Amino acid sequence: MPEVQTDHPETAELSKPQLRMVDLNLLTVFDAVMQEQNITRAAHVLGMSQPAVSNAVARLKVMFNDELFVRYGRGIQPTARAFQLFGSVRQALQLVQNELPGSGFEPASSERVFHLCVCSPLDSILTSQIYNHIEQIAPNIHVMFKSSLNQNTEHQLRYQETEFVISYEDFHRPEFTSVPLFKDEMVLVASKNHPTIKGPLLKHDVYNEQHAAVSLDRFASFSQPWYDTVDKQASIAYQGMAMMSVLSVVSQTHLVAIAPRWLAEEFAESLELQVLPLPLKQNSRTCYLSWHEAAGRDKGHQWMEEQLVSICKR
């Protein structure tokens, strides 16, 4: 019987890509180009010449057998493969960086930029608190804020285009961490000039009133939990883009709205609003701080996490 030839384990092992044959410096170039999505800016960040970065990108394309970056307007756009690689590469670089001597994060001198999403209506109270606190203890750090979730938020967290989200929504996927910060009491708001509402309502009366709400078409709308059936949605007479417009409309009409107590009380006097108990089972919402697990090993990220928890805990 003829003898079957098989590869020796040593031969199979040698056929695999060898890490020692890879120039790991290329990964720092990949990380910078992914973050900047512009060769010139990446070169500036790295302290390299533009031709040197372009050459490194060409070698990266060979290493990963993919284009990685394609021209887009005045910059470049990562391919699907580049996005797939980014989280793992960045996490690996952060692990190495954190172990280097003298690699501790120094907030007083750092010029790092953090991108936060503080969702409405929380932005109206937390943004100024966060901004002022960070400016006082780390004046060279820049914090960039936006105030709404969208369909791309998970993608932005995964690739650290947004580093933290503060919202009433938590992220259920195992790759995300969501830490509860506080629980907000919800109230029913009506104009002091409302012709029939002069005190607390009973549960069965709430949806007999006409309501103003944050638009249910908005991704992760603040108002969505209270209008989860067709019958409840039928009570809505006005849908606005933000809670402030909702409260303004309520103050000038016979509509009612559901809002956080702190927000309703802040504007109760100026808008002449009644702030009443909300006689529904869901009369509170938990606020969460969320981030992607890959970012949590970064010392600067850990510092900002501690600051946000300290500022926002009630």
From Swiss-Prot:
Induction: Gene expression is repressed by H-NS, activated by itself. More highly expressed in minimal than rich medium, poorly expressed in exoponential growth, levels increase in stationary phase (at protein level). One of its GO terms (biological process) is regulation of DNA-templated transcription. Residues 39-58 bind DNA. Keywords: Activator, DNA-binding, Repressor, Transcription, Transcription regulation. Residues 22-79 form the HTH lysR-type domain. Pfam families: HTH_1 (PF00126), LysR_substrate (PF03466). GO terms for molecular function: DNA-binding transcription factor activity; sequence-specific DNA binding. GO terms for cellular component: protein-DNA complex. InterPro entries: LysR-type_TF (IPR050389), LysR_subst-bd (IPR005119), Tscrpt_reg_HTH_LysR (IPR000847), WH-like_DNA-bd_sf (IPR036388), WH_DNA-bd_sf (IPR036390). Disruption phenotype: Has no effect on leucine biosynthesis nor on bgl operon silencing. Belongs to the LysR transcriptional regulatory family. A global transcription factor. Activates transcription of the 9 following operons; yjjQ-bglJ, yjjP, acrEF, ybdO, yjcRQP, casABCDE12, rhsD-ybbC, fepE and gltF, in most cases it probably interferes with silencing by H-NS and activates transcription. Represses transcription of the 3 following operons; uxaCA, sdaCB and btsT. H-NS repression of the bgl operon, leading to the ability to metabolize some beta-glucosides. It also directly activates the bgl operon. Activation is H-NS and BglJ-RcsB independent. This is HTH-type transcriptional regulator LeuO. It comes from Escherichia coli (strain K12).
